[in-house]
């Protein structure tokens, strides 16, 4: 606990804001080009082959981004849109690829939570 005199001399320091997605530079999304598309294994206790892509952004940063949903059409040189949001069981993955935007196609046969996966509304019979 500081004394009044110490507060008069120094004052209180406000905590510096630290972004969880620094490569976006305060933008909601950023465009980038896939350099590598691969699978990655999660931390314990989970087990899977998670689909990730290494993406070079327009601002020069290179980040690892998660490809959500079942199946994807991404390969090297695909142009993708990146948003913030980490994947808890993949260390170092702090970004998500936006499905249904640019070269990333939406998830096929998706009925629920369609807007999150860029899936069109199915035709009514």
Swiss-Prot record:
One of its GO terms (biological process) is translation. It holds the Pfam family Ribosom_S12_S23. SUPFAM superfamilies: Nucleic acid-binding proteins. The keyword RNA-binding applies. InterPro entries: NA-bd_OB-fold (IPR012340), Ribosomal_uS12 (IPR006032), Ribosomal_uS12_bac (IPR005679). The keyword tRNA-binding applies. One of its GO terms (molecular function) is rRNA binding. Part of the 30S ribosomal subunit. Contacts proteins S8 and S17. May interact with IF1 in the 30S initiation complex. With S4 and S5 plays an important role in translational accuracy. This is Small ribosomal subunit protein uS12. It comes from Clostridium novyi (strain NT).
């Amino acid at each position: 606990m500081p004394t009044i005199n110490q507060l008069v001399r120094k004052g209180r320091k406000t905590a510096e804001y630290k972004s969880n997605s620094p490569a976006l530079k305060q933008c909601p999304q950023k465009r980038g080009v896939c350099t590598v598309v691969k699978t990655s294994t999660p931390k314990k206790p989970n087990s899977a082959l998670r689909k990730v892509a290494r993406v070079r952004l327009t601002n020069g940063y290179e980040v690892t981004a998660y490809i959500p949903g079942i199946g994807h059409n991404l390969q090297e040189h695909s142009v993708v849109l990146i948003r913030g949001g980490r994947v808890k069981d993949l260390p170092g993955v702090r970004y998500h690829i936006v499905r249904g935007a640019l070269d990333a196609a939406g998830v096929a046969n998706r009925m629920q939570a369609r807007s999150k996966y860029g899936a069109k509304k199915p035709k009514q019979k």
